[in-house]
């Protein structure tokens, strides 16, 4: 049984590259999802479980749909059209994602009494991430259809596709975490990987001399997303933050007024540490730790030796010296 591909798909390398960038983008979106959700729902094991679970559901459904579609209508135009839609959806996440999360939370907080965190995070994941990853889940079975030309070497071909997907996934795991998110933030990370998927599909349609309107429309939409979705401000309702950004480990937010400097990590509504400028108490549970220096008998604060496990921002050490 033999089947011939047309145009650029005659070169299996392009099919392998499609599998590579698809796998890379799936992992990049998964890691980006954790950073997008962390300021609102934290980065706990519960949230990670929800992210991984919903993405696996989306990929499984995409595999089933992609396999059936490839058998019924083995037209590569449809596959690369789906990749364009997935790319544009991912590019729209920085534009509207945080508003969707806040909207879902606002609705559920008044309608749900128990397990608000679990339900809100799950619904947000379903609405924002399931559809594009469902579309990317259709890539592998479709590429198997296009790349297997005969049954003599089909095992080798499928194995090579799997290897390219896995290598792409590995790169898509490390690059966002250690390179793009610390350097340019979560929003631009989404745009970078959306742009890669879009460029891949555009190359296909240009080489096939097809889908001209589709290509032009997708470029315009992507340009709009780049122009409006580059901001990494998760607390979009705040106008007086001293600092808001991301590190390798956390989302960071610093708020300062005449009385205090407060740092939040990974959550918008909690406080990691508070520094009081006027030697006052915070009124929070942190104040209990300030009693420790009083337990030392007849020893001035500038001569104290204090072992602090986890220095953090150094707030406690500074306060102890006072």
Explain the meaning of each model-derived region:
Residues 322:
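Conserved S-adenosyl-L-methionine
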Residues 247-249:
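Glycine-centered tight beta-turn/hairpin loop motif at sheet-sheet or coil-to-beta transitions
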Residues 1-245, 256-272, 280-283, 290, ...:
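Alpha-helical transmembrane segments of multi-pass membrane proteins
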Residues 251-253:
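Short, surface-exposed charged micro-motifs
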